[in-house]
């Protein structure tokens, strides 16, 4: 599996395992939700700094984003749809 695919698979797996909506992870990492979606679909090529920020937001070591999935592992299922929580407002600088 290529690096971009590993990162995509692991970010999604960790996020879904912890019940974190994609929008919330993107907000907490300081990136746009559409970019996070692209990252999970292997459409984006994130920098090492961004991967470090995402790993920190997920509270895992950066190396966890490059772990090979077990043989026969399937793509994590999406979180159940439902009402989205209100997004917190960003503080003005």
Placement of each model-derived feature along the sequence:
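Residues within the alpha-helical elements of helix-turn-helix
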Residues: 17, 28, 39, 57
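Conserved hydrophobic/aromatic packing and binding residues within compact polymer-binding modules
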Residues: 11, 25-26, 36-39, 65
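Recognition helix of helix-turn-helix/homeodomain-like DNA-binding domains
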Residues: 30-45
């Amino acid at each position: 599996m290529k690096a971009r695919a590993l990162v995509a698979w692991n970010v999604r797996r960790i996020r879904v395992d912890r019940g974190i909506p994609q929008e919330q992870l993107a907000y907490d990492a300081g990136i746009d939700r559409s970019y996070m979606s692209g990252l999970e679909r292997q459409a984006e090529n994130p920098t090492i700094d961004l991967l470090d920020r995402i790993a920190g937001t997920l509270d895992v070591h950066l190396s966890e984003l490059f772990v090979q999935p077990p043989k026969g592992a399937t793509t994590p299922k999406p979180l159940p749809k439902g009402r989205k929580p209100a997004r917190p407002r960003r503080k003005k600088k």
